Swiss-Prot record:
Native organism: Homo sapiens
Pfam families cross-referenced by the UniProt entry: A_deamin, dsrm, z-alpha
Phenotype for residue 724 to A: No effect on nuclear location
Protein name per UniProt: Double-stranded RNA-specific adenosine deaminase
EC primary class: hydrolase
Expression across tissues: Ubiquitously expressed, highest levels were found in brain and lung. Isoform 5 is expressed at higher levels in astrocytomas as compared to normal brain tissue and expression increases strikingly with the severity of the tumor, being higher in the most aggressive tumors.
Region (Interaction with Z-DNA): 133-202
Cross-link Glycyl lysine isopeptide (Lys-Gly) (interchain with G-Cter in SUMO2) mapped to chain: 384, 408, 418, 580, 875
Region (N-terminal extension of DRBM 3 and constituent of a bi-partite nuclear localization signal): 716-725
Length: 1226
């Protein structure tokens, strides 16, 4: 019959440090008269694996054969010879724990458990520690034994130890430093270092008398002398894990016999610690990880306490202040606390840790509670205190009054230790890492040492219920001190004040519980579409209803309702505390109930804000109708990752509305929109009431906020906004804001598959607009929308200017009459801008877009699509609104093969250049009208000297460009863009961040964008360009710079006029004050005023006022601009001219000569020369006439030389052959 697993009858065992074998195991069991010291040593030897069976007091029990059923020892240990490789089985040890002896590992065979719960907590702790045993042969014991044999005070080196023990020096060093870290060895300085036994260890071993170097037990008179010291010291069981059990057994024996410990306190003394040995105990000194000494909850509590006092700290500083040494010791704890929402970090290298607001509030409340004076608690019996420590059942003993006495306990009962005549309070014991408790039945039996019997399978009834340690009953059953009825309760007002600091819902529920009242949240109404619902909630406390609240989510609605209820309750509680009379409080209650009733049946003005729409949608629609831009600004983000808080506010222009906080961005935006709408509603109410309107009129006007907002002028804002957005979206917004329906219809489709043609037509409010033809459906819709927009907005603008109440269809004749009226009759111009609150730059942009839209609203579809607009506005005085005198669009340059030797092509069709050429034509027309009789109505006046004319001091010219000029003025990203602001300061702050900024740049031929000029001298030639050399045209930023030095008039008009400079420059998009001012004026004064001092009178360096539009913010539009270019000046009346920018001629099959070409402008110069009797200039060529203006020519050469000297590059001009054409004398 094979022996059952886990049992052996042979029991042979070879010790690694002993030359002989134990051929026979000693099964001497202590009888009733045996010494307790002998039993203690047997118990220790059994725990170390040196005995196969557990010793029992009081009865001799022979080793049981495996065939006997029923009774089994608690820890059947099978020890076999290591050379034979037999298995060692310890009952109760889980799988995965291995024995290690002489380098050979033997896995445990886990027996099938028979479910049995432990009878008491102390034994469960003992078994759980026993399950953590790891039996192995350690080099540490060999080294310690060798050093002990050397004698006290003697030391040796690692090299000698390696030779004596036959172990590699590397392994010896590792063990030596490990022992030194545990405090068992002492390292002496030297090379190589000397090692010896630590003084504290020797003193303890000699004083305690447990084990001497010779191997005899000092305090065991009945110890087994056959066991040599090597049998006991060179054990294969880990000392670190056995130490708690040795301490328990030693405690039991010392309590029984009164043996004095090294700390000079008797075990039975009042100051003794039954659960822990002195500080040199191996159970604590052997733990290398600092976290092993401390409970995780204790570490977290220390971290929270420290952060509560210092507000923030790094991980290293935290570790040092709570008793650790390195940051890595608490990094894992901090990360775990961050997940729980107790702390959060800022920064990365290294992070700074803070307490979260919620954790700080909880700690503050806890501290405030603890600070309340408590009644003296009842004295805790010593039995409860002692039950917190690990104990073993020991025999009863009647000793002196200061001895420990225990009652007889049965199997499965809790041992209760009675302490008699104890007057001194015992200090709080050091805390060990809590043992691991396994849920479920234990795999080890329980031994009744007093009765000397093995435990049976019978489970007592008292073990069938969950039991806690005696020390835990008080914490669970007794009511906390702050709920004690003996303590004075805080007032309702103070409680409400504390609850107000929390989440509104949590605070209200806490107050209701405090006041022993029921609190309910009732949903009254749900409205709105499924994608944007609206919820209305109401708080009911003990049947009392509070004002409801409405929001876009249930959570927010509950929070708002709770906040309203908290506000009302707080006011009532405050009134009671302030000592108001009952009548006043009753009156306030009635008043509040009336408000509640009113809130339950809200007026239409209160509900019309968000009827069927979300607050964000309603606010955006209202802002669209007002022509203002609306922005949701994220002010801050707080809180941990699992519970963030976002703070948002709404900004409309320069006005900012109150900010709100919410747990999500969507909810925060909705709440911010609600606040903005309420503020707007309040402003509208106040403004209407201030106009002395009847009360019925006010309520009727407030029935719908949207019906009030269109009363403000919005058409100008729509004009600027719609013309700078996607045409389809702009038309749909326009139609929706006016209550119309808009649609696009495919009228016709033709052409081959590789080149189809689609004819689209837009319909708005039942009215069809002109059809357009395109090569794709998308382009067709965009162009149809653009055409419809221009017709609609043009009609509205004309009606507004002329004071019409209704919009009438615009025909060619009416347009012609309107344009003539606007251009010739100053009385027809409005004196003030209809756009309330707009800035100066908004006025300039509005005039430019209005004029362009009026000219092109019924023009051909070739003008549709993305374009760049530039215009020059003239103001006759500071109060004059201004009039557009020239405008142009375009973004192309002529191709090299389209150059003309006769001046018949326009080389640069960019919007800024075209508007300036139109401005020159305007100046020619004004000069032709000038005479001494009509000088009062002219914009000119005689200059000093009388030979030339100059612009009157009150007349100013302003340039508007819908985007930044190409070249140096547009070389920045959008993050550098400046916001629009109305500033009276005209000082420039140019940006010079790197040497590349300020360089001259040329435009790309037949494309968009610019490239820098080369550093070498470049002289373009006619034949080179014709043969394929790249045609270079200076960028718009560089040309505007030249206008601010030499003037807008050019070389030819310098014969008759003084230089004319711009007063301001306004941009609609991509504006940066530092980059723009550097590009258009300030780069020539980078090194001071030396350049300006070299200019001859009347030329100066002009620094115009710069700014951007604020009533809209254009979005970036993808796709290339069209090749067409439009030019117009005030002298042309209603006549628009459309050019092909790549050819420089009029768009059409005949390639007609443009009116802004060199040839036509030179023709106007010839007419002016005849009119002013300058016959000397009539016979000159175009180039010669320009050079004849010597002052201008000198200033131009100086300007080009200055740019080169400053390192900006060479100015590149067109070939000279292009300027050598003549005209017949006029």
């Amino acid at each position: 019959m094979n022996p059952r697993q886990g049992y052996s009858l042979s029991g042979y065992y070879t010790h690694p440090f002993q030359g002989y074998e134990h051929r026979q195991l000693r099964y001497q069991q202590p009888g009733p008269g045996s010494s307790p010291s002998s039993f203690l040593l047997k118990q220790i030897e059994f725990l170390k694996g040196q005995l196969p069976e557990a010793p029992v007091i009081g009865k001799q029990t022979p080793s049981l054969p495996p065939s006997l059923p029923g009774l089994r020892p608690r820890f059947p240990v099978l020890l076999a010879s290591s050379t034979r490789g037999r298995q060692v089985d310890i009952r109760g040890v889980p799988r995965g724990v291995h024995l290690r002896s002489q380098g050979l590992q033997r896995g445990f065979q886990h027996p099938s458990p028979r479910g049995r719960s432990l009878p008491q907590r102390g034994v469960d702790c003992l078994s759980s520690h026993f399950q953590e045993l790891s039996i192995y042969q350690d080099q540490e014991q060999r080294i310690l034994k060798f050093l002990e044999e050397l004698g006290e005070g003697k030391a040796t080196t690692a090299h000698d130890l390696s030779g004596k023990l036959g172990t590699p020096k590397k392994e010896i060093n590792r063990v030596l430093y490990s022992l030194a870290k545990k405090g068992k060895l002492q390292k002496e300085a030297g090379t190589p270092p000397l090692w010896k036994i630590a003084v504290s260890t020797q003193a303890w071993n000699q004083h305690s008398g447990v084990v001497r170097p010779d191997g005899h037990s000092q305090g065991a008179p009945n110890s087994d002398p056959s066991l040599e010291p090597e049998d006991r010291n060179s054990t294969s069981v880990s000392e670190d894990l056995l130490e708690p059990f040795i301490a328990v057994s030693a405690q039991a024996w010392n309590q029984h016999s009164g043996v004095v410990r090294p700390d000079s306190h008797s075990q039975g003394s009042p100051n003794s610690d039954p659960g822990l040995e002195p500080e040199d105990s191996n159970s604590t000194s052997a733990l290398e990880d600092p976290l092993e000494f401390l409970d995780m909850a204790e570490i977290k509590e220390k971290i929270c306490d420290y952060l509560f006092n210092v507000s923030d700290s790094s991980a290293l500083n935290l570790a040092k202040n709570i008793g650790l040494t390195k940051a890595r010791d608490i990094n894992a704890v901090l990360i775990d606390m961050e997940r729980q929402g107790d702390v959060y970090r800022q920064g990365t290298t290294p992070p700074i840790w803070h307490l979260t607001d919620k954790k700080r509030e909880r700690m503050q409340i806890k501290r405030n509670t603890n600070s309340v004076p408590e009644t003296a608690p009842a004295a805790i019996p010593e039995t409860k205190r002692n039950a917190e420590f690990l104990t073993c059942n020991i025999p009863t003993s009647n000793a002196s009054n200061n001895m420990v006495t225990t009652e007889k306990v049965e199997n499965g009962q809790e041992p209760v230790i009675k302490l008699e005549n104890r007057q001194e309070a015992r200090p709080e014991p050091a805390r060990l890492k809590p043992p691991v408790h396994y849920n479920g039945p234990s795999k080890a039996g329980y031994v009744d040492f007093e009765n000397g019997q093995w435990a049976t399978d019978d489970i007592p009834d008292d073990l069938n219920s969950i039991r806690a340690a005696p020390g835990e009953f008080r914490a669970i059953m007794e009511m906390p001190s702050f709920y004690s009825h003996g303590l004075p309760r805080c007032s309702p007002y103070k409680k409400l004040t504390e609850c107000q600091l929390k989440n509104p819902i949590s605070g209200l529920l806490e107050y209701a519980q405090f006041a022993s009242q029921t609190c309910e949240f009732n949903m009254i109404e749900q409205s709105g579409p499924p994608h944007e619902p609206r919820f209305k909630f109401q708080v009911v406390i003990n049947g009392r209803e509070f004002p409801p609240a409405e929001a876009g989510s249930k959570k927010v609605a509950k929070q708002d309702a709770a906040m309203k209820a908290m506000t009302i309750l707080l006011e009532e509680a405050k009134a009671k505390d302030s000592g108001k009379s009952e009548e006043s409080s009753h009156y306030s209650t009635e008043k509040e109930s009336e408000k509640t009733a009113e809130s339950q049946t809200p007026t239409p003005s209160a509900t019309s804000f968000f009827s069927g729409k979300s607050p964000v949608t309603t606010l955006l629609e209202c802002m669209h109708k007002l022509g203002n831009s609306c922005e949701f600004r994220l002010l801050s983000k707080e809180g941990p990752a699992h519970e963030p808080k976002f703070q948002y506010c709404v900004a409309v222009g320069a006005q900012t509305f109150p900010s709100v906080s919410a747990p999500s961005k969507k909810v925060a935006k909705q709440m911010a929109a609600e606040e903005a709408m309420k503020a707007l509603h309040g402003e509208a109410t106040n403004s209407m009431a201030s106009d002395n309107q009847p009360e019925g009129m006010i309520s009727e006007s407030l029935d719908n906020l949207e019906s009030m907002m269109p009363n403000k002028v919005r058409k100008i804002g729509e004009l600027v906004r719609y013309l700078n957005t996607n045409p389809v979206g702009g038309l749909l917004e326009y139609a929706r804001s006016h209550g119309f329906a808009a649609e696009f219809k495919l009228v016709d489709q033709s052409g081959p598959p590789h080149e189809p043609k689609f004819v689209y037509q837009a319909k708005v409010g039942g009215r069809w607009f002109p059809a357009v033809c395109a090569h794709s459906k998308k382009q067709g819709k965009q162009e149809a929308a653009d055409a419809a927009l221009r017709v609609l907005i043009g009609e509205n603008e004309k009606a507004e200017r002329m004071g019409f109440t209704e919009v009438t269809p615009v025909t060619g004749a009416s347009l012609r009459r309107t344009m003539l009226l606007l251009s010739r009759s100053p009385e027809a111009q409005p004196k003030t801008l209809p756009l309330t609150g707009s800035t100066f730059h908004d006025q300039i942009a509005m005039l430019s877009h209005r004029c362009f839209n009026t000219l092109t609203n019924s023009f051909q579809p070739s003008l549709l699509g993305r374009k760049i607009l530039a215009a020059i506005i003239m103001k006759k005085d500071s109060e004059d609104m201004g009039v557009v005198v020239s405008l142009g669009t375009g973004n192309r340059c002529v191709k090299g093969d389209s150059l003309s030797l006769k001046g018949e092509t326009v080389n640069d069709c960019h919007a800024e250049i075209i508007s300036r050429r139109g401005f020159i034509r305007f100046l020619y027309s004004e000069l032709m009208k000038y005479n001494s009789q009509t000088a009062k109505d002219s914009i000119f006046e005689p200059a000093k000297g009388g030979e030339k004319l100059q612009i009157k001091k009150t007349v100013s010219f302003h340039l508007y460009i819908s985007t930044a000029p190409c070249g140096d003025g547009a070389l920045f990203d959008k993050s550098c863009s400046d916001r629009a602001m109305e500033s009276t300061e005209s000082r420039h702050y140019p940006v010079f961040e790197n040497p590349k900024q300020g360089k001259l740049r040329t435009k790309v031929e037949n494309g968009e964008g610019t490239i820098p000029v080369e550093s070498s001298d470049i002289v373009p030639t006619w034949d080179g360009i014709r043969l394929g050399e790249r045609l270079r045209t200076m960028s718009c930023s560089d040309k505007i710079l030249r206008w601010n030095v030499l003037g807008l008039q050019g070389a030819l008009l310098t014969h008759f006029l003084q230089p004319i400079y711009l007063k301001s420059v306004t941009l609609g998009y991509l504006f940066s004050q530092g980059h723009l001012t550097r590009a258009i004026c300030c780069r020539v004064t980078r090194d001071g005023s030396a350049f300006e001092d070299g200019l001859r009178h009347p030329f100066i360096v002009n620094h115009p006022k710069v700014g951007r539009v604020s009533i809209y913010d254009s979005k970036r539009q993808s796709g290339k601009t069209k090749e067409t270019s439009v030019n117009w000046c005030l002298a042309d009346g209603y006549d628009l001219e459309i050019l092909d920018g790549t050819r420089g001629t009029v768009d059409g099959p005949r390639n007609e000569l443009s009116r802004v070409s060199k040839k036509n402008i030179f023709l106007l110069f010839k007419k002016l020369c005849s009119f002013r009797y300058r016959r000397d200039l009539l016979r000159l060529s175009y180039g010669e006439a320009k050079k004849a203006a010597r002052d201008y020519e000198t200033a131009k050469n100086y300007f080009k030389k200055g740019l080169k000297d400053m390192g900006y590059g060479n100015w590149i001009s067109k070939p000279q052959e292009e300027k050598n054409f003549y005209l017949c004398p006029v």
